[in-house]
């Protein structure tokens, strides 16, 4: 991500991997960051991204946050990270899209892009809420139950019944 942004004319302050949240907040403030990018390759990174978003909010930082990496998703970004941060939080699937998004946010489309993002994220959160709250009436659940005709199934009998002791 850093190389792609640098090749597109952006100054990048690369803090490396496994960077503590406090250091990210300090760097964002010290450099007056226009954008902040977080990338996660493993599942624990998702919790750390939430912590960073919360810490940035508490420090009063509102720069757009770009979320990417193998374990991330638009749904997780909308449902878990964005609510913890006052600035816009974008899920970026492809690292090559970071400079495109950054340029869009630097231009006349900034407010429109942020408004669209917030609308889409609200839609995702509402869909997730509906799916989490969805339950079937008992009659429908019984209608959908698994039906197995055991008389037609070939069951394999064990070759030995009882207890065996191995030395």
Stretch-by-stretch model annotation:
Residues 1-10, 161, 166:
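C-terminal accessory/binding modules appended to enzymatic or scaffolding proteins
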Residues 2-7, 14-84:
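Cofactor-cradling patches in redox/metallo enzymes
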Residues 11-14, 90-91:
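Conserved RecA-like helicase motor-core motifs
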Residues 33-36, 62, 86, 145, ...:
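Active-site lining segments that contact anionic ligands and/or coordinate catalytic metals
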